[in-house]
Amino acid sequence: MKVREVIRILENNGFRLDRQKGSHRRFEGVVEGQIRGVTVAGKESDEINKATLASIRRQSKLPNELFRSG
Protein backbone atom coordinates (compact mmCIF):
# COMPACT_ATOMS: atom_id res chain seq x y z
CA MET A 1 0.00 0.00 0.00
CA LYS A 2 1.31 3.44 -0.91
CA VAL A 3 1.50 6.48 1.36
CA ARG A 4 -1.04 8.32 -0.83
CA GLU A 5 -3.57 5.48 -0.30
CA VAL A 6 -3.16 5.66 3.49
CA ILE A 7 -3.59 9.44 3.42
CA ARG A 8 -6.77 9.04 1.34
CA ILE A 9 -8.16 6.48 3.84
CA LEU A 10 -7.44 8.79 6.77
CA GLU A 11 -8.94 11.86 5.07
CA ASN A 12 -12.05 9.91 3.99
CA ASN A 13 -12.58 8.97 7.64
CA GLY A 14 -12.42 12.47 9.09
CA PHE A 15 -8.69 12.90 9.68
CA ARG A 16 -7.15 16.23 8.70
CA LEU A 17 -3.52 17.21 8.22
CA ASP A 18 -2.41 18.93 11.42
CA ARG A 19 1.21 19.64 10.54
CA GLN A 20 4.06 18.47 8.34
CA LYS A 21 7.83 18.53 8.63
CA GLY A 22 9.72 17.10 5.70
CA SER A 23 8.13 13.81 4.68
CA HIS A 24 6.42 13.29 8.06
CA ARG A 25 2.74 14.23 8.18
CA ARG A 26 0.70 14.39 11.38
CA PHE A 27 -3.04 13.82 11.01
CA GLU A 28 -5.68 14.31 13.69
CA GLY A 29 -9.21 13.00 13.76
CA VAL A 30 -11.96 11.90 16.12
CA VAL A 31 -12.65 8.17 16.36
CA GLU A 32 -15.08 6.72 18.91
CA GLY A 33 -15.29 10.11 20.63
CA GLN A 34 -11.52 10.41 21.12
CA ILE A 35 -9.05 12.65 19.31
CA ARG A 36 -6.51 10.41 17.59
CA GLY A 37 -3.14 11.48 16.21
CA VAL A 38 -1.52 9.54 13.37
CA THR A 39 1.94 10.07 11.88
CA VAL A 40 2.49 9.04 8.26
CA ALA A 41 6.06 9.17 6.95
CA GLY A 42 7.32 9.02 3.38
CA LYS A 43 6.72 10.46 -0.06
CA GLU A 44 3.24 9.86 -1.48
CA SER A 45 4.61 7.36 -4.02
CA ASP A 46 6.50 5.28 -1.39
CA GLU A 47 5.31 1.84 -0.33
CA ILE A 48 4.58 1.46 3.40
CA ASN A 49 6.00 -1.65 5.03
CA LYS A 50 3.75 -3.96 7.04
CA ALA A 51 5.02 -2.91 10.47
CA THR A 52 4.51 0.79 9.73
CA LEU A 53 1.03 0.13 8.37
CA ALA A 54 0.17 -1.82 11.52
CA SER A 55 1.33 1.14 13.62
CA ILE A 56 -0.82 3.54 11.58
CA ARG A 57 -3.83 1.24 12.08
CA ARG A 58 -3.22 1.14 15.85
CA GLN A 59 -2.78 4.91 16.08
CA SER A 60 -5.93 5.63 14.09
CA LYS A 61 -8.19 3.01 15.71
CA LEU A 62 -9.93 2.65 12.32
CA PRO A 63 -11.17 -0.82 11.26
CA ASN A 64 -8.47 -3.07 9.78
CA GLU A 65 -10.66 -3.72 6.73
CA LEU A 66 -10.09 -0.14 5.54
CA PHE A 67 -6.37 -0.83 5.17
CA ARG A 68 -6.64 -4.02 3.13
CA SER A 69 -5.28 -3.50 -0.36
CA GLY A 70 -6.96 -5.12 -3.29
Regions found by a protein language model. Give the residues of each.
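C-terminal structural segments of small proteins and small subunits
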Residues: 43-70
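Ribonuclease/tRNase effector modules and their secretory precursors
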Residues: 4, 29-34, 64-70
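N-terminal first-folded block
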Residues: 1-21, 32
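A short, structured beta-strand/loop element
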Residues: 19-53
